[in-house]
Every structure is written in structure tokens, then in C-alpha cells.
Amino acid sequence: MSLQFNMIALLLVILILLGIFSHNSSITISAAVLLIMQQTLLAKYIPYLEKYGLSIGIVILTIGVLSPLVSGKIQLPGLSAFVSWKMFVAIAVGVFVAWLAGKGVPLMGEQPVLVTGLVIGTIIGVSFLGGIPVGPLIAAGILAVLIGKF
């Protein structure tokens, strides 16, 4: 088996480097796993990953979000906390962000090359504006709204 040098492999290497530079381990690990899969006999499993990967990832993310509640690190607030204006704003922001992420999923599927632009933007924001890396679904959702793909 020999290494395949193609544009996809080059893109994955660029994403790995951008992920390392921006301290975005999600991008680094994801691109590295896909590059290894592409370059080995694991390539036959890429269609399964393409079909089910996003759904599995969302389930794992949801488990991660809910686990502090189950472990007791976060307590459910009392009923009075739900009627405060801050709680209403928090719920509205949560709904809005979930809606944005939902808009990002189709965009990432239709135009996956835009993920590279999102990573470059993340690097600039982290490096020069003191930002932190955020999820690509929300960034893609914002992009989808801005370019009219919703």
C-alpha cells in the first residue's frame, strides 16, 4: 500500500496544521483521523462515517452537555429561577444557537471546503483577537444565514 498524494490529502494536512497552530484539537484530531483512514485500509469505512458520523457526534456532544447535570455538578434551578429575565434570555439564546447550528449542518455537507475558511477565521480570532475556538456547526450556521443558504 502506498500513500496517496491528492488534493484531499493536502487539504487534510493543511487542516491538521491549522488546527495545531490555532490550538483547536477538534480540527487537528478530526483531520488526522480522516487522513489516516484515507491513506490506509480503513478507507472502506469512510462512507459509514460520512453517513452516520455527524449524528453520532451530536449524540456524544449532547451526552457531554448533560453529564454535569447527571453527576450533580450542576443542579436544576428552582421554579423561581425560570421566571427571571436572565433565564428567558438564556433560553432564547439557546434556541437561537441551536437553530444556527441546524443551518450549518447542510452547508457543511453541501460545501465542505468552507470548513477551511471557518478554521482560518478561527485561527485569526484566537491569535489576534483573544478569542477561543468555537464549534464549527454554529460558525457554519452563521455563515449559512449570512450567505442566504437557509
Curated annotation (Swiss-Prot):
InterPro entries: UPF0756_TM. Its main location: membrane. The chain crosses the membrane at residues 1-21, 52-72, 81-101, 128-148. The keyword Membrane applies. It comes from the Bacteria. Keywords: Cell membrane, Membrane, Transmembrane, Transmembrane helix. It is found in: Cell membrane. It is a multi-pass membrane protein. One of its GO terms (cellular component) is plasma membrane. HAMAP family: UPF0756. PANTHER family: UPF0756 MEMBRANE PROTEIN YEAL. Belongs to the UPF0756 family. This is UPF0756 membrane protein NT05HA_0561. It comes from Aggregatibacter aphrophilus (strain NJ8700) (Haemophilus aphrophilus).
